[in-house]
């Protein structure tokens, strides 16, 4: 990394020849990605004078550095320093110190020993106060402390008499010390964006002041003593509430720039005309009704802006401003202009739009230098003929709709005045009907809205019409700015509040009820706490959210809407979010009366979201049901049931829909922030979003949810919490591990909170289905609390989840209760053997309810074999359980499950990557948890138990819960990085199995569960990058995880575990994975890949790691929001505390995704989604039959995306694509299936991890289609997490990943086997020469299959006699998998594009009828 360093050496020309040592005085190590100060620096400690270490990742300064006593300049901006060592006092010759953009909270007292220090730049650090010793730096001439947390300055600050520049912008200052009157040499003082209510009197003494900023404060008037600043040339007091400027200001004889914009002025002082040197006067955005006649005295003024006022006429004296170059008076009430303005001989730009002008004076023809004039939105009937003399005119705007700057004018005689005038077709002008509403800059800043807009701006790649409603408000700042400075004042305050809360929560989190509400400003924390308080509500919400999320998954457009709403209401997040969640839940479950108010809110919100985001119905075949999305929460239960099948089918189609540009956009947004919201269609999601909306962290988290289906929300909350060290999200796993443990030990209500959060997660993951019995629902609420207490180490959230599931499902799946095991304890399972208690977060994810209830439902499960198609575990658990719950409620759902299972049967032995399953199991396609492929892949109910060797012991046909337990044992078997994958998968399975297979070892789960929240993120980064690779969902998940991780930083890990079960699963991966963000995706991936178990195999929550296990498993220490990096400006920039970069400088490559996630992630998701969907669309080959099923449109796009992604992946990691370990099959299924976990995205995780990821079935499979995954994983971690892969992208990913895992042969006998009892599964390797030499038919939306018309599979129809496949394939062979990509339920065009894009070697898994 040091190759970039430059050595500036002062050399005597031939010194090297004379053998003399060179004298190194300057070293520049800027932008070298250094994590510590290079040791070679110390060899020059005697001569080194300047050291530049800008923009690295240095966390601490070694003591040796302070032996460089000749050092004059030390430049350390943009690093990860959290403290400035006291030994800095040794640098007695230090003159310039730059430590801006770090996480430094305070200066050491003995910095006073740096006597010659003249320049200190410490902006963008969370410095709350200056030490008294700081005022002893008597030689200080420049001090920059912008964007810190200063509330006051030392009383003896006036000792710094040599100060010339003092910048204190973006702090919380309310007053200045009186001793500052001694700073007579001060020339520049910047007090902008503070909290002053009046101009400090001490300013009167600063006689040397030349430039003074006091904008964006709370001033109400400008005192006359400002006039005593005779040297003042620049005065900016804009963006205040100034109602009056005293006349004394007129004595500032040297004033050149006076900025009074955005205040409440109704008049200007009459003496303003005496400011003879003013060149710029800005008085726009006030309430001026007239300009004083004395304004003509401003003879030097060149720019005068009085727009956005209430001026009705201009004084004739204004004609004396002969030097005027720019005049703006738009948005006033001018009816005419004084003819004197003709004397503005130097005017070049004249803005007069939006007035009431009916005529213009002839004298305007004398403005010979006029180049641009805007006259639109007036009442002009014509123009004076003298305009023909305006020879330099380049633009004359007469209408807002004008197509060209200059429109030809025609001569005409005015019928009234009989004068020659100019006119054209735009005259007479038509006044606007509606009043123009101007949004002033000083308008209060809405952090949630701003964040929403930022996210939207980050999703430009796939802008959809559905998203436009969310983007109505103009963006305030570019989303690409790393640290928007100055930060919006409200955001800054929010960060400060969060920091305070974090510190407070550190102490309170363990003891405090997670339900405790905070102030609105602490809404993020507040929300988390609220979650704790409103456990039952939260649970309800979760359910409804799960259902809704399923719907949203089905219709991404709706999902996206959800998110904006959630974001929009950060202030009321705690209550509103919960209420929304409960509302949604209620709608879905119909048995949660407790939260009726909330329900209503969330219903409306969701309805609004649904309206905003057009459902993807048109694209998906079964989408129509999905249309219900979040509009009818109360009908959700029924709707989801009926939708279950559709939803599952739609999952795939949704992905396809997502593929479409608009859909993609939705998906992308989902993957970003929207994606989370989408995942959480229901209010619960909103709750999570609200909680984290202010902190971008939520964005990532939600993405995880999308990808993993349930973890995302949890993750978001958890991360948020961990970051902020708040109780609010404790319910989920938000509390740090330690905190949670404390809560658990205390049997605190935190369980309730956890339950609440978990419920949310569950809902997000459609865990509602997990709840086995409606009867359990009321009971579960209580039970969850009880169980939480009982579990102790288990997560409080487990119970909550359980409640959620029960409530939501009124479920028939007792197994679902086992989901509580997600916490890592089967205790819960034991407690409620008959019902599955989904963990709030784990369960949601694990259940994969989003798939379809049928898949999860035990009855359906029966037929389902081991074909838990490669759904992402999250998806499986989420989609399957949740939707299943809904389906279960309907009862008929189970048949659907069977159907899905059947499809699964065909690909049964190919548990394949979840994505493959996705392709194969359309009915299961709905991924509540994952928005893309993973959802598509719903697992059948059949679940295979795997021994520690990853071998299925027996197929368990479980309604969904079974898959978890089976996998669980395997999982703990490989608790390493590989375990990440397997454990992730296992967790999912475990969640499902808890009930049926309480046998699963918690031990195995704990590792994977371990830092669940962290793992969610981590997985995305760490080994699970492989999982990420598995699918777009994984990518999304990884993204979210990554983002979460990024936001949370170290805290992320702790929070991760709080994520939903899937995420939790991810944690296992995480801990294996160093608990990197990749772990998130890893977990998700694992979850996805139930071993052959049902796609939706229910995974007993108990199988998940308990909180403690999760923690011990390697979860990174929970990070306080303020810990690590105390909310430096950069840290909190947009994300707020949760975004703390503190996570420790910059993450290693494995975890880089968390850090880089933002833009690159977005790009990736955007790119992949669009590409994948496009790939689908671009199946381009005739094989792709768009008609076949309504899916086709979306599928074709998805296929295109997949195709593109596959190409990328193959190009990047061709070697991985074909590798398919026998174990891999199972593994891929679990790993790949977790698209969310895969969210890590291929780039996030190194190929190695991809290649080996234990599946939940305990098998170790190569990472699903590592090449594809790798390409993303290997992309810089940043890129690695496509910020939020679109649903299509996820699907595509899944499909690609599925390819990675060889068919799951063991599950061979699963429901799929039912389809082809006499079939033999064969693995074939074909070398392209130059092509594959065979033709295929069939596929979803294909033209039909000549061999089995009722089968949507891909069949070989023709083999070239002498071609590469002539001796390997024969007509009638059904292709189950190719290079790890599942060909089950795949669209024809997609299959074609995949086969064509594969590199030379294509490894096929086919099913051949041995005896019919």
UniProtKB/Swiss-Prot annotation:
**UniProt cross-references to InterPro entries, sorted A to Z:** Leu-rich_rpt, Leu-rich_rpt_typical-subtyp, LRR_dom_sf, LRR_R13L4/SHOC2-like, PDZ, PDZ_sf, Synaptic_Scaffolding_LAP-MAGUK
| Stretches with biased composition (Polar residues) | 663-681, 817-835, 1075-1086, 1157-1171
Gene Ontology biological process? basal protein localization; cell adhesion; cellular response to tumor necrosis factor; epidermal growth factor receptor signaling pathway; establishment or maintenance of epithelial cell apical/basal polarity; integrin-mediated signaling pathway; intermediate filament cytoskeleton organization; intracellular signal transduction
List the biased-composition ranges (Low complexity).
533-542, 650-662
Provide a Gene Ontology MF annotation, just one: signaling receptor binding
Tissue specificity, per the record, is: Highly expressed in brain, heart, kidney, muscle and stomach, followed by liver, spleen and intestine.
| Residue positions where Phosphoserine is found in the record | 440, 444, 569, 598, 602-603, 620, 715, 852, 857, 872, 931, 1158, 1179, 1286
- According to its UniProt record, where is this protein mainly located? other
The record's region (Disordered) falls at 464-489, 506-542, 615-681, 803-867, 997-1021, 1075-1192
Question: Residues where Phosphothreonine occurs?
Answer: 485, 917
Q: Which UniProt keywords apply?
A: Cell junction, Cell membrane, Leucine-rich repeat, Membrane, Nucleus, Phosphoprotein, Repeat
Phosphotyrosine modification, residue list: 483, 920, 972, 1104
Pfam families cross-referenced by the UniProt entry: LRR_14, LRR_8, PDZ
Q: How does it assemble?
A: Interacts with ERBB2, BPAG1 and ITGB4. May favor the localization of ERBB2, by restricting its presence to the basolateral membrane of epithelial cells. Also found to interact with ARVCF and delta catenin. Interacts (via C-terminus) with DST Isoform 3 (via N-terminus). Interacts with NOD2 (via CARD domain).
Protein family (similarity comment): Belongs to the LAP (LRR and PDZ) protein family.
Task performed by this protein: Acts as an adapter for the receptor ERBB2, in epithelia. By binding the unphosphorylated 'Tyr-1248' of receptor ERBB2, it may contribute to stabilize this unphosphorylated state. Inhibits NOD2-dependent NF-kappa-B signaling and pro-inflammatory cytokine secretion.
**Name of this chain's protein:** Erbin
Query: From what organism does this protein derive?
Result: Homo sapiens
Which lineage is the organism of this entry classified under, starting from the top rank?
A: Eukaryota, Metazoa, Chordata, Craniata, Vertebrata
């Amino acid at each position: 990394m040091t190759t970039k360093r430059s050595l500036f050496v002062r050399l005597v020309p031939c010194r090297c020849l004379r053998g003399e040592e060179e004298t190194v005085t300057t070293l520049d190590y800027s932008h070298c990605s250094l994590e510590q100060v290079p040791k070679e620096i110390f060899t020059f400690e005697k001569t080194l004078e300047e050291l530049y270490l800008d923009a690295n990742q240095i966390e601490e300064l070694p003591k040796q550095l302070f032996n460089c006593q000749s050092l004059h300049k030390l430049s350390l901006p943009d690093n990860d320093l959290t403290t400035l060592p006291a030994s800095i006092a040794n640098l007695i010759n230090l003159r310039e110190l730059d430590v801006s953009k770090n996480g430094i909270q305070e200066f050491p007292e003995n910095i006073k020993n740096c006597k010659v220090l003249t320049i200190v730049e410490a902006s963008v650090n969370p410095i709350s106060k200056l030490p008294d010793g700081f005022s002893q730096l008597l030689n200080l001439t420049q001090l920059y402390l912008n964007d810190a947390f200063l509330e006051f300055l030392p009383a003896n600050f006036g000792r710094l008499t040599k100060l010339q520049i003092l910048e204190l912008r973006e702090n919380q200052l309310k007053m200045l010390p009186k001793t500052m009157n001694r700073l007579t040499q001060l020339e520049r003082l910047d007090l902008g964006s503070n909290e002053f209510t009046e101009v400090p009197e001490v300013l009167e003494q600063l006689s040397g002041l030349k430039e003074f900023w006091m904008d964006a404060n709370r001033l109400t008037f400008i005192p006359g003593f400002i006039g005593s600043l005779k040297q003042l040339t620049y005065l900016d007091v804009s963006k205040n509430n100034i109602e009056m400027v005293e006349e004394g200001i007129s004595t500032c004889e040297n004033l050149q720039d006076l900025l009074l914009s955005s205040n409440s002025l109704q008049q200007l002082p009459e003496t303003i005309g005496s400011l003879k040197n003013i060149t710029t006067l800005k008085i726009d955005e006030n309430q001026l009704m007239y300009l004083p006649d004395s304004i003509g005295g401003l003879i030097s003024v060149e720019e005068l802006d009085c727009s956005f006022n209430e001026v009705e006429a201009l004084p004739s004296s204004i004609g004396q401003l002969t030097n005027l170059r720019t005049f703006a008076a738009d948005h006033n009430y001018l009816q005419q202009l004084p003819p004197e303005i003709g004397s503005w001989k130097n005017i070049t730009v004249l803005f007069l739009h939006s007035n009431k002008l009916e005529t213009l004076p002839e004298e305007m023809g004398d403005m010979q230098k006029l180049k641009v004039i805007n006259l639109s939105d007036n009442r002009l009937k014509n123009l004076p003929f003298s305009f023909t003399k305006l020879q330099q005119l380049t633009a004359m705007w007469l209408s807002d709709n004008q197509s060209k700057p200059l429109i030809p004018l025609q001569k005409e005689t005015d019928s009234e005045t009989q004068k020659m005038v100019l006119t054209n077709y735009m005259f007479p002008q038509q006044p606007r009907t509606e009043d123009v509403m101007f949004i002033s800059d000083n308008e209060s800043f809405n952090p949630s809205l701003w964040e929403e807009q930022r996210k939207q701006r980050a999703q430009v790649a796939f802008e959809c019409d559905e998203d436009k409603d969310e983007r109505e408000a103009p963006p305030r700042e570019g989303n690409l700015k790393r640290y928007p400075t100055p930060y919006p004042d409200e955001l800054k305050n929010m960060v400060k509040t969060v920091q305070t809360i974090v510190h407070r929560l550190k102490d309170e989190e363990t003891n405090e009820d997670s339900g405790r509400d905070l102030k609105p400003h602490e809404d993020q924390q507040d929300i988390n706490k609220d979650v704790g308080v409103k456990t039952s509500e939260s649970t309800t919400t979760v359910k409804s959210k799960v259902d809704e999320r399923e719907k949203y998954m089905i219709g991404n457009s709706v999902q996206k809407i959800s998110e904006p709403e959630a974001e929009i209401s950060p202030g009321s997040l705690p209550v509103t979010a919960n209420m929304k969640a409960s509302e949604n839940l209620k709608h879905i479950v119909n048995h949660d009366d407790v939260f009726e108010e909330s329900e209503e809110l969330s219903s409306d919100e969701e309805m609004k979201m649904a309206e905003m985001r057009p459902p993807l119905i048109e694209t998906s075949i079964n989408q129509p049901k999905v249309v219900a999305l979040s509009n009818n929460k109360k009908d959700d239960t029924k709707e989801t049931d009926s939708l279950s099948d559709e939803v599952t089918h739609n999952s795939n189609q949704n992905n396809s829909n997502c593929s479409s540009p608009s859909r993609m956009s939705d998906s992308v947004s989902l993957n970003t922030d929207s994606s989370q919201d989408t995942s959480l269609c229901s209010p619960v999601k909103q709750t999570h979003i609200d909680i984290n909306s202010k902190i971008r962290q939520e964005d990532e988290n939600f993405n995880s949810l999308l990808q993993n289906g349930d973890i995302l929300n949890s993750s978001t909350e958890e991360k948020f919490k961990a970051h902020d060290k708040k109780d609010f999200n404790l319910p989920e796993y938000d509390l740090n591990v330690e905190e949670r443990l404390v809560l658990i030990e205390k049997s605190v209500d935190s369980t309730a909170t956890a339950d609440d959060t978990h419920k949310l997660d569950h809902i997000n993951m459609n865990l509602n289905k997990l709840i086995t019995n409606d009867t359990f629902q009321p009971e579960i609420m209580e039970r969850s609390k009880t169980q939480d207490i009982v579990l102790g180490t288990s997560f409080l959230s487990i119970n909550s989840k359980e409640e959620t599931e029960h409530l939501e499902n009124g479920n028939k799946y007792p197994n679902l209760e086992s989901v509580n095991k997600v916490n890592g304890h089967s205790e819960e399972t034991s407690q409620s053997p008959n019902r599955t208690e989904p963990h709030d977060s784990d369960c949601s994810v694990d259940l994969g309810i989003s798939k379809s209830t049928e898949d999860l439902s035990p009855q359906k499960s029966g037929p389902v074999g081991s074909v838990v198609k490669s759904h992402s575990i999250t998806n499986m658990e989420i989609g399957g359980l949740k939707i299943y719950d809904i389906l279960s409620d309907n009862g008929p759902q189970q048949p659907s499950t069977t159907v899905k299972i059947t499809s699964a049967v065909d690909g049964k032995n190919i548990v394949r990557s979840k994505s493959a399953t996705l392709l194969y199991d359309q009915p299961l396609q709905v991924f509540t948890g994952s928005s893309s492929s993973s959802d598509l892949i719903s697992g059948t109910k059949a679940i295979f138990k795997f021994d520690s060797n990853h071998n299925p012991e027996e197929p368990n046909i479980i309604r969904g819960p079974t898959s978890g337990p089976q996998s669980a044992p395997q999982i703990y078997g490989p608790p390493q990085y590989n375990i990440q994958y397997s454990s992730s998968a296992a967790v999912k399975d475990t969640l499902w199995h808890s009930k049926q297979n309480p046998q699963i070892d918690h031990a195995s789960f704990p590792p994977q569960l371990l830092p669940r929240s962290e793992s969610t993120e981590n997985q995305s980064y760490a080994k699970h990058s492989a999982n990420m690779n598995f699918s777009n969902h994984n990518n999304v998940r990884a993204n979210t995880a990554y983002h979460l991780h990024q936001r949370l930083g170290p805290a992320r890990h702790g929070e991760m575990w709080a994520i939903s079960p899937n995420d939790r699963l991810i944690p296992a991966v995480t801990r294996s994975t160093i608990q990197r963000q990749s772990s998130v995706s890893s977990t998700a991936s694992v979850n996805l890949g139930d071993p052959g178990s049902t796609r939706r195999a229910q995974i007993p929550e108990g199988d998940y790691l308990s909180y403690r296990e999760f923690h011990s498993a390697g979860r990174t220490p929970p990070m306080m929001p303020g810990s690590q990096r105390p909310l430096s400006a950069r840290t909190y920039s947009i994300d707020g505390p949760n975004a703390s970069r503190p996570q420790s400088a910059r993450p290693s490559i494995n975890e880089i995704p968390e850090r880089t996630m933002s833009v690159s992630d977005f790009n990736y998701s955007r790119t992949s989604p669009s590409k994948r969907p496009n790939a689908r669309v671009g199946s381009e080959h005739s094989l792709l039959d768009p008609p076949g099923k309504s899916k086709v449109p979306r599928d074709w796009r998805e296929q295109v995306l997949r195709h593109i992604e596959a190409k990328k992946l193959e190009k990047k990691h061709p070697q991985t694509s074909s590798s398919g370990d026998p174990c891999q099959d199972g593994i891929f299924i679990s790993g790949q299936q977790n698209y969310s976990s895969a969210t890590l995205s291929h780039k996030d995780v190194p190929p190695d991890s991809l290649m080996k990821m234990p599946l939940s079935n305990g098998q170790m499979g190569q990472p699903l289609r590592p090449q594809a995954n790798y390409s993303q994983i290997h992309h810089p971690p940043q890129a690695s997490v496509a910020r939020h892969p679109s649903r299509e992208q996820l699907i595509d990913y899944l499909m690609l990943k599925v390819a990675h895992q060889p068919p799951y042969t063991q599950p061979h006998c699963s429901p799929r086997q039912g389809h082809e009892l006499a079939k033999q599964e064969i693995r074939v390797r074909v070398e392209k020469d130059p092509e594959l030499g065979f033709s295929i038919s069939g596929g979803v939306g294909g033209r039909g299959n000549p061999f089995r018309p009722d089968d949507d599979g891909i069949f070989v129809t023709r083999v070239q006699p002498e071609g590469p496949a002539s001796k390997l394939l024969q007509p009638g062979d059904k292709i189950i998998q190719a290079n790890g990509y599942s060909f089950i339920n795949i669209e024809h065009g997609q299959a074609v594009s995949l086969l064509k894009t594969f590199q030379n070697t294509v490894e096929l898994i086919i099913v051949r009828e041995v005896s019919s």
